[in-house]
Amino acid sequence: MERTLTILKPDCVRKQLIGAVIDKIERAGFRVVAMKKTKLTTETAGAFYAVHRERPFFGELVEFMSSGPCVPMILEKENAVEDFRKLIGATDPAEAEEGTVRKLYADSKGENIVHGSDSEENAQIESSFFFSTEEAVRVNN
């Protein structure tokens, strides 16, 4: 069973879409292994997105991700990383396929509702950023 990390971003929380997005995730066959509501500081957002430090959008991304509460979650499913990326759609909601999370709920490329890990390796790294081993308990059945 593969795992991936998602973050329901501050715009998702602000628009009161947490339940709708989690419903879509669960209906797609994902199991929520761990979940918490938290607020990132600019420092923690910067550390999480450090891979983008040299990109022109880094400052705006950090500012946005620290603008309000977010909901990181570890999800589990066969082929979790790839399937979740398909479920959420393209980064830019204008380019996302119909029915995807971003097409349904996102306003812009910058405020696009949800983060999803882009590889199994990054999913493990990102999951450990938010959750301890004890919090990321194995789901049975």
Swiss-Prot record:
Its EC number is 2.7.4.6. CDD domains: NDPk_I (cd04413). It is found in: Cytoplasm. InterPro entries: NDK-like_dom, NDK-like_dom_sf, Nucleoside_diP_kinase, Nucleoside_diP_kinase_AS. Its cofactor is Mg(2+). It catalyses: a 2'-deoxyribonucleoside 5'-diphosphate + ATP = a 2'-deoxyribonucleoside 5'-triphosphate + ADP; a ribonucleoside 5'-diphosphate + ATP = a ribonucleoside 5'-triphosphate + ADP. The keyword Magnesium applies. The active site is at 115 (pros-phosphohistidine intermediate). GO terms for molecular function: ATP binding; metal ion binding; nucleoside diphosphate kinase activity. One of its GO terms (biological process) is GTP biosynthetic process. It holds the Pfam family NDK. ATP binds at residues 9, 57, 85, 91, 102, 112. Keywords: ATP-binding, Cytoplasm, Kinase, Magnesium, Metal-binding, Nucleotide metabolism, Nucleotide-binding, Phosphoprotein, Transferase. Disulfide bonds: none annotated. GO terms for cellular component: cytoplasm. Homotetramer. Belongs to the NDK family. Major role in the synthesis of nucleoside triphosphates other than ATP. The ATP gamma phosphate is transferred to the NDP beta phosphate via a ping-pong mechanism, using a phosphorylated active-site intermediate. PANTHER family: NUCLEOSIDE DIPHOSPHATE KINASE, NUCLEOSIDE DIPHOSPHATE KINASE DDB_G0292928-RELATED. This is Nucleoside diphosphate kinase. It comes from Chlorobium phaeobacteroides (strain BS1).
